[in-house]
């Protein structure tokens, strides 16, 4: 009996070490993404939510491992995970636009500081011993299930676009491997809170791998540029202040002395412009300043590029 118990402990330790190594690979998988963010000095529309939630999950599991005896291998991997996710989020906050930085800061304050603080306070004050372990265990299970369910949006995107661009096979493979290893670790340690969420993690990982095999050779659906941007999570913003650009007949150009008309508009003949050419129209500073003084609103005229439809028309920029 003692031999079987020793053998079980040995296997549990072995699977725990393997789980640490594989989970480390999963934590490091976004490195190419953040290297690109660092190189381009832009987050390119990437979302910070997965990293905030992963950091929250690591914090909870590390707290659980401190409370439960004999869970040192959970402390090591989740401690490393906290450090890695913190570095990712620091880079995101450094290069993200202001709106994304504000949203990320709010999530960190609300989830990783606010909610985690409440959980720690309640479990420390209102529970003791095994009760505290069970309360924390079920909380960790709930958070882990939400983390494993997060790829559902990616699965939906793959089915809609027929493209596996957003779901690399290597990440899905390591997620499945990690789920199997940690399930066996929890089984050998008789820790249901570790084993249970990894069952769902295994199911979702296998589903992602099956989708990858199904769609890897299929041609992705062709979408418009705006649809592709929206699918990637980017936001399209138009200029807020654009001066009106109108087309008038060439006769108006001939009637206007020195290329100007009485309403204060500048006229540019475009006889030699082909229909497919693009003309950039600029408003000179002198005319802009004169108009701003008359209007009194402080708006600045902007430059706008227009597609010329007919070669016998002229562009008039109202200033």
UniProtKB/Swiss-Prot annotation:
<feature type="topological domain" description="Extracellular">
    <location>
        <begin position="1"/>
        <end position="10"/>
    </location>
</feature>
<keyword id="KW-0812">Transmembrane</keyword>
<keyword id="KW-0472">Membrane</keyword>
<feature type="topological domain" description="Cytoplasmic">
    <location>
        <begin position="94"/>
        <end position="106"/>
    </location>
</feature>
<feature type="transmembrane region" description="Helical; Name=6">
    <location>
        <begin position="168"/>
        <end position="188"/>
    </location>
</feature>
<feature type="domain" description="MtN3/slv 2">
    <location>
        <begin position="135"/>
        <end position="219"/>
    </location>
</feature>
<dbReference type="GO" id="GO:0051119">
    <property type="term" value="F:sugar transmembrane transporter activity"/>
</dbReference>
<feature type="transmembrane region" description="Helical; Name=7">
    <location>
        <begin position="192"/>
        <end position="212"/>
    </location>
</feature>
<keyword id="KW-0677">Repeat</keyword>
<feature type="transmembrane region" description="Helical; Name=1">
    <location>
        <begin position="11"/>
        <end position="31"/>
    </location>
</feature>
<feature type="topological domain" description="Extracellular">
    <location>
        <begin position="128"/>
        <end position="134"/>
    </location>
</feature>
<dbReference type="GO" id="GO:0005886">
    <property type="term" value="C:plasma membrane"/>
</dbReference>
<feature type="topological domain" description="Cytoplasmic">
    <location>
        <begin position="213"/>
        <end position="319"/>
    </location>
</feature>
<keyword id="KW-0762">Sugar transport</keyword>
<comment type="subunit">
    <text>Forms homooligomers and/or heterooligomers.</text>
</comment>
<dbReference type="InterPro" id="IPR047664">
    <property type="entry name" value="SWEET"/>
</dbReference>
<feature type="topological domain" description="Extracellular">
    <location>
        <begin position="189"/>
        <end position="191"/>
    </location>
</feature>
<comment type="function">
    <text>Confers blight susceptibility. Confers TAL effector-mediated susceptibility to Xanthomonas oryzae pv. oryzae.</text>
</comment>
<feature type="transmembrane region" description="Helical; Name=2">
    <location>
        <begin position="51"/>
        <end position="71"/>
    </location>
</feature>
<dbReference type="GO" id="GO:0008643">
    <property type="term" value="P:carbohydrate transport"/>
</dbReference>
<comment type="similarity">
    <text>Belongs to the SWEET sugar transporter family.</text>
</comment>
<protein>
    <recommendedName>
        <fullName>Bidirectional sugar transporter SWEET15</fullName>
    </recommendedName>
</protein>
<dbReference type="Pfam" id="PF03083">
    <property type="entry name" value="MtN3_slv"/>
</dbReference>
<feature type="transmembrane region" description="Helical; Name=4">
    <location>
        <begin position="107"/>
        <end position="127"/>
    </location>
</feature>
<feature type="transmembrane region" description="Helical; Name=5">
    <location>
        <begin position="135"/>
        <end position="155"/>
    </location>
</feature>
<feature type="topological domain" description="Cytoplasmic">
    <location>
        <begin position="156"/>
        <end position="167"/>
    </location>
</feature>
<keyword id="KW-0813">Transport</keyword>
<dbReference type="GO" id="GO:0016020">
    <property type="term" value="C:membrane"/>
</dbReference>
<feature type="transmembrane region" description="Helical; Name=3">
    <location>
        <begin position="73"/>
        <end position="93"/>
    </location>
</feature>
<feature type="topological domain" description="Extracellular">
    <location>
        <position position="72"/>
    </location>
</feature>
<feature type="domain" description="MtN3/slv 1">
    <location>
        <begin position="13"/>
        <end position="99"/>
    </location>
</feature>
<comment type="function">
    <text>Mediates both low-affinity uptake and efflux of sugar across the plasma membrane.</text>
</comment>
<dbReference type="InterPro" id="IPR004316">
    <property type="entry name" value="SWEET_rpt"/>
</dbReference>
<keyword id="KW-1133">Transmembrane helix</keyword>
<keyword id="KW-1003">Cell membrane</keyword>
<feature type="topological domain" description="Cytoplasmic">
    <location>
        <begin position="32"/>
        <end position="50"/>
    </location>
</feature>
């Amino acid at each position: 009996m003692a031999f079987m118990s020793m053998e079980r402990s040995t296997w549990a330790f072995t699977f725990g070490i393997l789980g640490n190594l594989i989970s480390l690979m999963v934590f490091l998988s976004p490195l190419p993404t953040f290297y690109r963010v660092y190189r381009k000095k832009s987050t390119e529309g990437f979302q910070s939510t997965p990293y905030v939630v992963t950091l929250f999950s690591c914090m909870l599991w590390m707290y659980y491992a401190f409370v439960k005896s004999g869970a040192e291998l959970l402390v090591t991997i989740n401690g490393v995970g906290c450090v890695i996710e913190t570095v990712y989020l620091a880079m995101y906050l450094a290069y993200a636009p202001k709106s994304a930085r504000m949203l990320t800061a709010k999530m960190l304050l609300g989830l990783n500081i606010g909610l985690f603080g409440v959980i720690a306070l309640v479990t420390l004050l209102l529970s003791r011993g095994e009760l505290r372990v069970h309360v924390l265990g079920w909380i960790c299970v709930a958070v882990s299930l939400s983390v494993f369910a997060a790829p559902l949006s990616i699965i939906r995107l793959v089915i809609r676009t027929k493209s596996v661009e957003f779901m690399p096979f290597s990440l899905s493979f390591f997620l499945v491997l990690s789920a199997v290893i940690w399930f066996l670790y929890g089984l050998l340690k008789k820790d249901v809170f570790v084993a249970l969420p990894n069952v769902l993690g295994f199911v979702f990982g296998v589903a992602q791998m099956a989708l990858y095999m199904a769609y890897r050779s299929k041609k992705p659906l062709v979408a418009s540029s705006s649809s592709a941007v929206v699918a990637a999570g980017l936001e399209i913003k138009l200029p807020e202040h654009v001066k009106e650009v109108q087309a008038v007949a060439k006769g108006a150009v001939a009637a206007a002395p020195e290329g100007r008309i009485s309403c204060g508009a500048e006229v540019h003949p475009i006889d030699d412009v082909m229909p497919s050419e693009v003309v950039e129209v600029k408003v000179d500073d002198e005319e802009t300043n004169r108009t701003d003084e008359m209007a009194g609103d402080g708006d600045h005229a902007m430059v706008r590029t227009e597609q010329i439809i007919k070669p016998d028309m002229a562009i008039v920029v109202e200033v």
